[in-house]
Amino acid sequence: MAHKIRVGVLISGGGTNLQAIIDAYRSNRIDARVVFVGSDNPEAYGLKRAQKHGIPTFAVDYQAIIKETRGRPLEDLVPEGFDLETVLAKQRVSPLSSDRTKVEQYFRSRAIAEAVLLKEMEAYPFDLLVLAGFMRILTPYFIDRVNTDPSQPRIMNIHPSLLPSFPGQDGYCDTYRYGCKVGGCTVHFVDYGEDTGRIIGQKAFEITPDDTIDTVREKGLKLEWQLYPECIQLFAEGRLRMEKPS
């Protein structure tokens, strides 16, 4: 095997995709190793999965941080280098509110949490950051501090639909309810929007009249566990770079 890239993983829940990645590198199917697992949820079972394999873990309790900052003036609490106008100009998430004050509060509070997350990650140098069921939208403040080379994005996400169809939290459910005959999953680079980054890989499955939401999810998850390691391997081989349109 070639030189193994260092992969950091962020999760929010059970960590089944994390387990698939761990299994892939422990069986030498990918040129990678997981150097840390972090979560916004201190109770995430995926942290225990990582600990069983001796992988360092940490948790940044987003919910507690956001609750603590709610209703407080945050101008003096935001991290050094945070520029609200720059963040607002770059972000392409759907409008969070028509209330400018609430929008500003949202991005300031997330930057405060992200600064804590970045500080935790400093202890574990990494080449690629993988979101494996991390249920927080990353702001430009965070993304720009990980993606320091415009030609080489370093944050991957996996999404439960064939993007660009059905972005958002529950892609399998949306796919099923829309009546699609084909479902699937997508691995993409993370950009300033929600599930709008460059697509790296996709896998599809048939949806039959006998399928339910649960069986659709089951089919999708099995493909996710194949697709994510494959896309990490493409990154490890240096085959993923961003090129400007000619």
Locate predicted features:
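One-carbon transfer enzymes
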Residues: 1-246
